[in-house]
């Protein structure tokens, strides 16, 4: 997403939302446990398999060994999908990493295997049996330390500046030069992190909860083409 021009007026500017009470459309259903979530469309897919993701234990490096033998032979397991047997996978424009890592690891917790089984519990149990060995590589994990030698992305122009900030700041009667930080924060969503996928002939339907629906659809199509 690129903002390179004024956004113009929006409902927040017109004060039609902020400062006024509004009922959530799905509020009552959520607090009473009747709101349908993405993975609950069982009327469209009555018999489903369950997938459980195995993620990378390192942030940067490569997989030297990925042993799925025990997982393959665990009760209820239908398949163990890795980069080695998944076939060609594309990469969407909005994704920063490939769908399945291997042998190269691009980030911590990158998906490196998907265990598919008849039940969720079987998939989860089998996922714990996947044995992975890594060759860890050095990386940069301190954002503040990396700032001095950071470079601007090539697709963006340099910031537009007006005046001489350094001189004005040095000559100001009162200055404030401080750094403020905040720890990582995670949204506590009520909806489980799960999606439902099913086929009607050659048409694939995905039921998922995603803020960027168009991006999700287009990138998924490019990944699976």
Residue ranges and their predicted role:
Residues 80, 161-168:
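Predominantly extracellular/luminal regions of secreted and cell-surface proteins
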Residues 35, 165-224:
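Conserved beta-alpha junction segments in alpha/beta enzyme cores
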Residues 153, 158-160, 181-182, 187:
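Non-catalytic, substrate/partner-engaging modules appended to enzymatic cores
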Residues 1-157, 171, 175-178:
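Flexible, low-hydrophobicity surface segments
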Residues 75, 224-225:
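A broad structural signal for alpha-helix termini and local helix breaks/kinks
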Residues 63-64, 161, 212-213:
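Residue-level preference for nonpolar/small residues embedded in alpha-helices
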């Amino acid at each position: 997403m690129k903002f390179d021009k004024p956004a113009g007026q929006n409902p927040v500017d017109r004060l039609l939302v902020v400062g006024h009470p509004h009922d959530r459309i799905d509020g009552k259903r959520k607090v009473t446990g009747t709101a349908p979530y993405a993975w609950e469309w069982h009327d469209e897919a009555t018999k489903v398999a369950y997938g459980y993701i195995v993620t990378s234990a390192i942030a940067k490096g490569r997989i030297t060994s990925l042993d799925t033998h025990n997982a393959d032979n665990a009760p209820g397991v239908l398949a163990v999908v890795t980069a080695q047997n998944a076939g060609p996978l594309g990469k969407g424009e909005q994704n920063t990493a490939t769908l399945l890592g291997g042998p190269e690891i691009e980030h911590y917790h990158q998906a490196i295997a998907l265990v598919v089984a008849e039940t969720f519990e079987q998939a989860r149990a089998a996922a714990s049996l996947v044995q992975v060995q890594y060759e860890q590589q050095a990386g940069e994990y301190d954002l503040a330390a990396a700032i001095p030698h950071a470079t601007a992305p090539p697709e963006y122009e340099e910031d537009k500046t007006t005046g001489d900030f350094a001189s004005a700041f040095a000559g100001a009667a009162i200055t404030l030069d401080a750094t403020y930080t905040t720890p990582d924060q995670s949204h506590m969503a009520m909806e489980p992190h799960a999606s439902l996928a099913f086929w009607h002939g050659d048409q694939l339907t995905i039921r998922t909860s995603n803020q960027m629906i168009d991006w999700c659809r287009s990138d998924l199509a490019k990944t699976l083409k």
